[in-house]
């Protein structure tokens, strides 16, 4: 275990009063109201939370001083269920009592190797064998890591944060808190040490009133998902003495992710102090208002980057986490106060005394802070990247995030250094291996533990410690956290697992705590870039030193950066970049520490490519929202937690989800010399030259932090990202967060603008990218940074880590997106940066993560078999997922793979959360991208994409070509895309088409999360998608590794010709559209495929959908042109094409649009030419499918998953998809590409038509089924149509049709996964699908397909695929019309009217046969329909479960519809024919698909309602009326439907018609009325009565009176209700005959008023009896008591107390004269005489008694 002590020591130092002042988080300091309010609202700190030390008042929390926040005990954490600002709910956040939390901490830390705060000495005591305690205590690595990093004894206790302190205990166990914060009911502020909790106010002034500043708030803010924040990283092995953070050697899992600390970096007290991560508070501080940071407080700004981003509480939270985590960040901030606070921050649980603890703070503050930073990073918004990274990236991201966090640039540096160290990933893996399942949050601890084990390596890779933490976060999550984050299996659960996400959004480096203003953030971003530039020198030198102990420079930089608040922002700019580039930065951090640090906050220009990319994007977006950098809805807050506060983001069950550690921008990250790793580079943001690597490493850092030998000779920022230095999940996570928080469209555009549109940001981004690119990728220009992001993402995708990273991103993004409502705007910029950054890391991870993720994969393999096999194994072996054929789609798939592979294992736990996340992102972003935003996105994308593409190509070629570069690229792209999903539609599009796919996936994942119907299935689908992407990439790599023409080569010559011709036909429009649609499709496909794979456990499906996706992609691109996307992004399309050329396998990496546009062609060609091989690969990857159809199946399924896998709502589609997939399994070879494309189109279409998804989806589903049914001949037609439309069509062989059918069913099955979140994309997909399948029917055909996929599916089953729909020809135009109306209208709404109309026009061209029969397009349609139906129905199981939707959505054409012979000469329609013949299904089909006008009249003027009424089809009549049939429709002779019903004596229909307002008074033109048409007495009587009621009747006319009966009329006389007189109540004399009095009801009559009778119990022996007052009787009889007693001695007289009498009477149910009681005193003790009421007395009183017998009406009188 790493000695977390130094880092945590820093954290604690950070917490001390001095640090508090430095952070500018003084209690008196008030955080901007806007931030505070938003954060407060989000945080919703619950005072009732049992905080042992400090409960933060919600209002107070907002005002809480940064240090005060830090001082809060973890138990002061927000109660579970508390929502963190930015709408981040950290379910993992559990209220953890001081004691309870500590107890929980050890248990949760068992995996983390951290002991609860209560047991400082047991700091590393995890429940698992990996317990850090064992490491710390015994000095032996708990996880087999040699060299527990012992900090000095003092450090150990004071500097090392306990698991609780780190928030790890909760994350580790995830049992205690519903928020998945294992072990802790409350999130203990990472910086808060148990000692600190107990610390005297004098020592820790800010701790003085922890209750005041409820740590709860901060803890809630703290990313509790930072599983990678293993306390062991900061383990206070050395109880006293100087704290050292030892990172395992680079050869360990995350060598490239060096910790901020140098090898046994010695954090000087001042350094630690300075490095104290304000973000530790910032994790809580992520709510700036919480930290009480003032805009003017530069320190606060660094410390609480999130503070600037109040509207993104979540983002803020992430930011806070980032900032808080890196002690260096604190160092960057105010130097002297920080050091103390920082050291304090890492409060070392082991510290025996507060003084010792305090003492260690300054010394270890940076190191522990850094270490802690990493784990917290895991919990941060960078979790998304972390998630995908699944350990490697998580670490990188952890570091990156933390470093990014404005508050803790120093920390940031630490994180990056750690990432550079890269050793932590291995530790992380090891940790994961041990506690994958049961230590979701404990992953961080485990990472730390692993780090501890790798003491030497950790020492060497002190910077790696942070990374380790991240890696651990990413990996340790496996067991329990995977469930939490099933969507993003690889990721830490933090980002994906929303409930636990403290800071889902990559913590934007909105570090400037002072100003939460958006513009400030924007400035912050720009400033960040500047800060990077001007602060980087310090940052670099300070990075290592800061990590190691040098924080003077860092502090200075931090001070300068944060002093202005803007500088802090500037510092956060890297952080923001890191946040937006969270994933990328993280990866870069893994690859290059600089990236990592930068990643947390806004994307920094400095971070090689990611940093730069994100920086501009982050900067631009940052101004938009509070802090766009925190796109994830989580501030890029690096959580600076004391070792004792193992603060792990509960929402990051994935090991890759990292809690970003914000490092002040001022911090200079100098290359850290990691032992065995070579120089570790701090985050570019921290680098003086503004590049990822230090000057000496700028051009080609050899990834001194343990780049694997397989890695390229140089490491760019993207390489770093790819290497896991920057966790892609962290980067993409932000974008997703943005999507959720802010409108996806807005987010997309925000990203776009933030990153591209903003000239300053762009220039800054370019500069940063150039610098970092120059440093990292000397050959890659500024744009290359962006593109390399994609490209590297693609490359990284090959790496397990990257995939995992993106999976986390997906989940985190989903989480973020859901919770990013407030932080959305702020997240936008970061998302952009992160997406790009995420993309970058993708490629690099292929190289570095190959090794790192090999170990990570091993670790993650424990976490997730899927991840291990797919993500990690692919990184190492890629054969499983390298589908040469699918490689074209692999770009998208890769990114999807990264997301989905990771997501599935996490998704299992999280269910549809991850997919939903992705979906959400896809939904919104794709919408802008495909519809309105698509052109802008494309335009924005092209410039960057173009250059970036080329650069990416180079990077891919260098990094990825050697191995499964394409696969890696695609996976990286996938991963990057996951991260970039949000910005994919906007700025992300330019960067990477796979980004868009990821965005779509994010939307889809989000939809899944929202729908949660596909929770696991969605995760499976996503996983399958990712696996398929990987297979596809492998295929590509195998066949055409990383070549421009690889995709082209993948397609068979015919397909290529066809596709080429199609594209040539529509060179720009089609290409761009194709790119857009393909991007969306690819995104959705990949994501969906992953989901589908999980759902169906059919990697084949995944592959098949991918193939299908690719095959269909060209058509998809063409439909987009119809959509109008074509026109806008023509150049982007060209760029996309070029990008595609640049990186055949990294197509997605390079540009989602281009890849999407060309990938389909390539995929088709590839599949045609290499169909067998892809199938083989698919078979390898998916064990459940046939080899030959496997590819097609997988392609179809992938498309289905992409389209529907992310739509949990469409169960019915899912079933259809399943069925189709089964069908397609047999015929999978021919049409995988096309079907994939169709499905892609559907996926894109839902994105485009998010609003009209329900209708469109339903219709496309039917159309799909229909097309499916007619796939054989339709295929041929499709070929021609595709060619005509410029849609690359496969051979159109029957197998493809069959495959399409199968795939369609598979799609339908999987579509539910993706549909909910990709409705808009679904529409696009539909459009594309129609283009793919019904090439001619561009707009409506797709809609028709949407309407008829089920039909086609059914038809495919019932009718020969090649059979023409001659009889249903009339239906096809109508169906098209219907589709156009439903989906087309929707398209119109979504600015796709053109496409809709166009599609409609084209649909008629193919004719009904074509529309119904194209199997290839139909299979996408069913998939699309599933997509559409899923969102609406959310019925994953029932493909046609949406009967109501069937009305709105397309229903598959019933076989009868084709068999019906319609007499068109008579003007008859299929609807009329079906209504006449009673074919209800056909009628419904026609109605739902609007095949025919419900009121269409034949030549005689008869409509369908006439026909149904005349023939008595009640149900059909009802359907017709429900669909708006004119109840009084008149034929030419004036006959109304009512007349037909009466004439034919259909009484029920008459009733129904009358209920619908039929006019019974209307007569035919010949004068016949309904009364003259009756043929039965019943009808006549009914009509007579009805008319009488209408017209009224005379009062004396009773003939027509209606009789109304009660329910008794329905009962037999002998079984009537209970007869009251049958068994009257009362005592029965057993001596008397039964019938004497048993059935008598007694009535008493008297001439005078009866005396009141009282039912009283006078003795215990007897029950209550009837009594009269003796006084009343005497009055009545006018005699005295004595005379009465003597005359009637037989009458019983008793005496009772008045009070008792009153009590009994008043409570008697038989007493009904309350007025009689008024004369009695309830409290009187006087005695009352009572006389028993008997017949004799009654007679005496002159009353007559009657007994009424039920059977005898006679009565006897007794006197």
Curated annotation (Swiss-Prot):
Residue segments, region Disordered: 100-120, 399-432, 540-635, 739-795, 1079-1190, 1222-1334, 1397-1456, 1612-1635
Residues in cross-link Glycyl lysine isopeptide (Lys-Gly) (interchain with G-Cter in SUMO2): 787, 873, 1259, 1417
A Pfam family hit: PUFD
InterPro entries, per database record: Ankyrin_rpt, Ankyrin_rpt-contain_sf, BCOR, BCOR-like, PUFD, PUFD_som_sf
Any one GO biological process: specification of axis polarity
Phosphothreonine PTM sites in chain numbering: 1128
Signal sequence residues: none
Biased composition (Basic and acidic residues): 739-767, 776-786, 1081-1111, 1169-1178, 1256-1282
Subcellular location: Nucleus
Biased composition (Low complexity): 552-580, 1426-1439
Tissue spec: Expressed in heart, liver, lung, skeletal muscle, spleen and testis.
Keywords assigned by UniProt, alphabetized: Acetylation, ANK repeat, Chromatin regulator, Isopeptide bond, Nucleus, Phosphoprotein, Repeat, Repressor, Transcription, Transcription regulation, Ubl conjugation
Top-rank taxon, per record: Eukaryota
Region called Interaction with BCL6, residue ranges: 498-514
Bias (Polar residues): 582-617, 1298-1316, 1440-1451
Region (Necessary and sufficient for interaction with PCGF1): 1638-1752
Modified residues (Phosphoserine): 336, 340, 365, 367, 423, 1131, 1143, 1293, 1348, 1413
GO molecular function terms noted in the UniProt entry: DNA-binding transcription factor binding; heat shock protein binding; histone deacetylase binding; RNA polymerase II transcription regulatory region sequence-specific DNA binding; transcription corepressor activity; ubiquitin-protein transferase activity
Repeat region (ANK), residues: 1466-1499, 1500-1529, 1533-1562
CC annotations in GO: BCOR complex; nucleoplasm; nucleus
Quaternary state and interactors: Interacts with CPNE4 (via VWFA domain). Isoform 1 may interact with MLLT3/AF9. Interacts with BCL6; the interaction is direct. Forms ternary complexes with BCL6 and SMRT/NCOR2 on selected target genes promoters; potently repress expression. Can interact with HDAC1, HDAC3 and HDAC5. Interacts with PCGF1; the interaction is direct. Interacts with KDM2B. Component of an approximately 800 kDa repressive BCOR complex at least composed of BCOR, RYBP, PCGF1, RING1, RNF2/RING2, KDM2B and SKP1.
Free-text function comment from the UniProt entry: Transcriptional corepressor. May specifically inhibit gene expression when recruited to promoter regions by sequence-specific DNA-binding proteins such as BCL6 and MLLT3. This repression may be mediated at least in part by histone deacetylase activities which can associate with this corepressor. Involved in the repression of TFAP2A; impairs binding of BCL6 and KDM2B to TFAP2A promoter regions.
PANTHER family: AGAP007537-PB (PTHR24117), BCL-6 COREPRESSOR (PTHR24117:SF8)
Family membership noted in the UniProt record: Belongs to the BCOR family.
Name this protein carries in UniProt: BCL-6 corepressor
Taxonomic source organism: Mus musculus
Lineage, opening ranks: Eukaryota, Metazoa, Chordata, Craniata, Vertebrata
